[in-house]
Structures are given as C-alpha cells and as structure tokens.
Amino acid sequence: METPLREQENSLESSNERSSCILEADATTPESANLGEEILSQLYRPLEACYNTCYCKKCCYHCQFCFLKKGLGICYEQSRKRRRTPKKAKANTSSASNNRLIPNRTRHCQPEKAKKETVEKAVATAPGLGR
C-alpha cells in the first residue's frame, strides 16, 4: 500500500506528462504554424476600402476599416482647410461694407414713416361706430 501523498504525486506526474505531450504535438504541427502566420499577415496588411454607407451595428463591425471609421469616428483622410483672407483685404471689405450700409438704412426708414402717416390719416377720417 502506498501512502496518499505518493498516490497524488504519481497522478500529478502522469497528468503533467500527458499535457506536455499534447502541447508539444500542437506546437509542431504545420497547420498551427500556418494559422499563426495567417493571423499575423492579416494584422499587418493595409485596410481595404469599404464603400458601405450604412451605420447600423452589423455594418459598423463587419470589418476593421468600418469599425475605425463608423464605430470610433476616426478618419485619416486629409481634411480641407479654409484659406484665410489677408488682414488687409478684411480691412478694405469692412470699410466698404460700412459705407454701403449707411445709405440703405436711410432708404428703408423713409417709406415706413410714410406708410405710418397714411395709416393714421385713414383711421382718423374713417367714421367709427360710436357708443
């Protein structure tokens, strides 16, 4: 009869031997090596263009490009920047626009006064119903 400790040690040794054999066999198969290379090649290949414009959950996660663009909102395209007008050009246009606005204001105010006067005259001359 063996002691319980010896039985446990024997069972552990046999289980360790089995697992190590399995791991060695898996690591040496050419299929697993090809699978690892395939995964690495997919990671480093450039993203393919995808022209799907849908933003549903299925379309946002169907490829890495759509996930980055639609899911995360990251876009690496060059954005078009507006051209700023030179300071001198701004000063010239602002002074010219101020000169144009002054006569327009006086033109609009005069017809409104005339309309108010005609409305007041019409109300004053119209006979109203008394009490």
Swiss-Prot record:
Coiled coil: none annotated. InterPro entries: IV_Tat, Tat_dom_sf. Residues 92-101 have a biased composition (Polar residues). Belongs to the lentiviruses Tat family. Residues 50-66 are annotated as: Cysteine-rich. Residues 67-77 are annotated as: Core. The gene is tat. It comes from the Viruses. Its main location: host cell. This is Protein Tat. Residues 121-131 have a biased composition (Low complexity). Transcriptional activator that increases RNA Pol II processivity, thereby increasing the level of full-length viral transcripts. Recognizes a hairpin structure at the 5'-LTR of the nascent viral mRNAs referred to as the transactivation responsive RNA element (TAR) and recruits the cyclin T1-CDK9 complex (P-TEFb complex) that will in turn hyperphosphorylate the RNA polymerase II to allow efficient elongation. The CDK9 component of P-TEFb and other Tat-activated kinases hyperphosphorylate the C-terminus of RNA Pol II that becomes stabilized and much more processive. Extracellular circulating Tat can be endocytosed by surrounding uninfected cells via the binding to several surface receptors. Endosomal low pH allows Tat to cross the endosome membrane to enter the cytosol and eventually further translocate into the nucleus, thereby inducing severe cell dysfunctions ranging from cell activation to cell death. Through. It holds the Pfam family Tat. A motif (Nuclear localization signal, and RNA-binding (TAR)) lies at residues 78-84.
